[in-house]
């Protein structure tokens, strides 16, 4: 899955140019662990694979991070009404976005991804960042978004740019707004806000 991109990702991760884009990068998981980005950047393919195997013969698929209950009360996620109400947000593909707190404040990267390059690849100014802890859609949309995602990953790594999956999701949401239906939450970026929003809808 990530194999063809491994060497490029490690070259960027260990380069002085990338590490110097922000003081925190070197000590962050994506900077200090060779496995962090290959794993989180493979979420889209894992979701796509699940939609192909489709063991439950369903139309919609959602990625939920295994550790998401560190920030969301698990009782909300086992609430049957949530999954019933979630369905309408998955048409065609859901990203949950929060306003980038450093937008317009001179910060030159988003999760390590160079800001100007991110906007150029998005074809517009990215003011909202997509969360990677919960996303999904219908089978057809997942197939399309997955294709765009891996082309974008390839192009960005070839140009020497790397953030996390959230950087790439944010580009896709800006570039393909009719396909990637963004639902916005507050500046803290906690997905629990979206879960509660869906429950209250």
Regions found by a protein language model. Name each.
Residues 92-109:
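Short beta-strand-to-loop element that shapes/binds the nucleotide-sugar donor at the catalytic cleft/hinge
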Residues 68-70, 74, 114-201:
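Catalytic core and acceptor-binding pocket of nucleotide-sugar-dependent glycosyltransferases
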Residues 50, 96-99, 138, 172:
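Structured loops at beta-to-helix junctions and adjacent beta-edge loops in soluble globular domains
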Residues 54-60, 106-117:
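Surface-exposed flexible segments
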Residues 1-55:
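Active-site-proximal specificity loops/subdomain of glycosyltransferases
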Residues 39-97:
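GT-A fold catalytic core of metal-dependent nucleotide-sugar glycosyltransferases
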């Amino acid at each position: 899955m990530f194999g063809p991109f491994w060497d490029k990702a490690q070259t960027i991760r260990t380069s002085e140019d990338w590490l110097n884009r922000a003081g925190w990068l070197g000590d962050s998981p994506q900077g200090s662990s060779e496995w962090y980005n290959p794993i989180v950047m493979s979420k889209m393919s894992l979701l796509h694979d699940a939609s192909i195997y489709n063991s439950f013969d369903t139309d919609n698929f959602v990625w939920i991070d295994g550790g998401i209950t560190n920030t969301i009360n698990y009782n909300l996620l086992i609430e049957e009404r949530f999954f019933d109400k979630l369905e309408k947000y998955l048409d065609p593909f859901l990203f949950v976005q929060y306003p980038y707190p450093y937008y317009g404040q001179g910060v030159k990267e988003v999760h390590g991804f160079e800001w100007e390059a991110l906007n150029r690849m998005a074809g517009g100014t990215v003011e909202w960042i997509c969360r990677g802890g919960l996303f999904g859609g219908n089978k057809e949309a997942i197939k399309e978004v997955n294709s765009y995602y891996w082309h974008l990953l390839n192009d960005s790594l070839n140009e020497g740019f790397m953030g996390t999956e959230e950087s790439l999701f944010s580009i896709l949401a800006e570039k393909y707004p009719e396909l990637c239906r963004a639902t916005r939450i507050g500046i803290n970026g906690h997905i629990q806000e979206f879960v509660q929003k869906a429950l209250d809808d």
